Amino acid sequence: RKPYPSIIIGVRKGGTRALLEMLSLHPDVAAAENEVHFFDWEEHYSQGLGWYLGQMPFSSPHQLTVEKTPAYFTSPKVPERVHSMNPGIRLLLILRDPSERVLSDYTQVFYNHVQKRKPYPSIEEFLVRDGRLNVGYKALNRSLYHVHLQNWLRFFPLHRIHIVDGDRLIRDPFPEIQKVERFLKLSPQINASNFYFNKTKGFYCLRDGGRDRCLHESKGRAHPQVDPRLLNKLHEYFHEPNKKFFELVGRTFDWH
């Protein structure tokens, strides 16, 4: 059968792939392989819910289906569309330090260009215009979490959106995954022994029934060297937006 899924709605470069892989350790989770882009791409949305459910893996009656498309979080039309499919849906949102997320966002696009042997400007060229922070840079906008979350809160109460601390998930995955299990009403099946620290890679990998697997080598890539003064500008820029976000969700995060 193919029931409505729970959705990891974002954020891009927040740790959505890691979260989905970790959740997949649970026997009662059936995870969609690819980012479906149903609610944000018109050519998919126009094909209707039947098409969407067709992209989901088959699941048994006791299983929960999960899909992730990080672009959903920052796409203004998506919350209403998700709500019209299933107002009672449980949503997962994984966030990390907004400045770090911007650097990671740049790094991904930079490496995509490198692989295609295409030139790509330095991060400074995106972040600075006329000696000031370039607030028109899309990656900055994606890190204004309070702006995008407000859009979702017009359609869903906060208790329907579980916010995963992406920085903690990478440092110490098990406690964060336990919270996700509880939120999704899954039985506690994932254990601390499912995670082991890989010294070579510098982050946690997964152990699943004797099978070890690490996230794709694109994960944990080094960010570009950024001038400390520019980093400070980034931190200053996000200071107020972060405060607004903390007020919105009633909790704080250990961000710059």
Report the location of each language-model feature.
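Generic structural signal for small/hydrophobic residues in well-ordered secondary structure
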Residues: G15-T16, Y52, V66, V82, ...
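PAPS-dependent sulfotransferase catalytic domain
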Residues: K77-E80, S84, G88-L93, E100-L184, ...
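Marks the mature luminal ectodomains of secretory-pathway proteins
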Residues: G10-R12, M22-L23, V180-L184, K244-F246
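Short histidine/acidic/glycine/proline-rich micro-motifs that form metal-
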Residues: H37-F39, T69-F73, K138-A139, G166-I170, ...
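Structural motif corresponding to alpha-helix initiation and N-cap regions
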Residues: S46-L49, S75-P76, H146, P228
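The conserved 3'-phosphoadenosine-5'-phosphosulfate
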Residues: Q150-K243, G250-H256
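PAPS-dependent sulfotransferase catalytic core
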Residues: R1-F73, M85, I89, S99-R129
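Generic structural signal for well-ordered alpha-helices
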Residues: L49-L53, P79, L149-Q150, N242
